[in-house]
Structures are given as C-alpha cells and as structure tokens.
Amino acid sequence: MSSCAAHWQVSTKYCIAPSREGALAYMQNMVRRTRAAAPGKRIVISETGWPDKGSAFHGAVPSTEGAMAYFVDTVQWAEADGIEVFYFAAFDEAWKVGAEGDVGAYWGLWDKDGQPKFT
C-alpha cells in the first residue's frame, strides 16, 4: 500500500470523548491504531480542537482553561510523536452558533475580532 487515508472523529458535539482529556487520549489511540494498520505512513491530523464557550455535554465542558490546555497538550504530544496537526480553528466563527449548537462558534485560538484568547 503506497498511500492510505483514515478518518476518525474526535469531538464533534463531544460525541466520542466525555472530556478534554478523553479527547486527547482518543486521538492518541487512533494514531497508534493507524500506525499499526499502515506502518511507515505519514500521519496528518487535519482537524482537532476544544471550544472555550458554550454548554457542557455530559462530561465535556467548554472553558478557556480547557481550550488552552487541550491546545498545549496536543501540540506537545504531536511534536514529541512526530505528528502533523492542523488545529481547529484559528478564529472563532460567529456564524456557526446556530447550526452547531452554542459551542460551534467558539473553537478559535483568536476571537471573532482577532484578539488572542490565551496569554
């Protein structure tokens, strides 16, 4: 097999992971499983993130502290493990609040006005 693509969903409406920590552990497990199924293949995580505002869904709680911790933990793990990651999203997307529930608009590292959320 010269190339392959795998798709696994981490936390749309927090449907798989009950917590921020669980989302990262799930992603790490999926990378291990993908490596086992396709040894030597380049792995790119094309979208991951954690919202900083909105309603909790079971044990998944959006918060500024949680979003920052998820970002830092993801980047540190990805660098240590040689994984390429596209973090979602650069900016909050205010228009998504209806279609994606009240968390949909709050996945950015910067707010909708371009101000950084984390210092």
Pin down the residues of each PLM region.
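Aromatic- and acid-rich polysaccharide-binding/catalytic face
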Residues: M1-A25, V44, W50
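Structural recognition of the beta-strand scaffold that forms the well-ordered cores
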Residues: M1-S2, R42-S46, E84-A89
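Catalytic-core region of carbohydrate-active enzymes that cleave or remodel glycosidic bonds
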Residues: M27-I45, S55-I83
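Aromatic-rich peripheral "rim/lid" segments of glycoside hydrolase catalytic domains that contact
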Residues: A56-G66, W77-T119
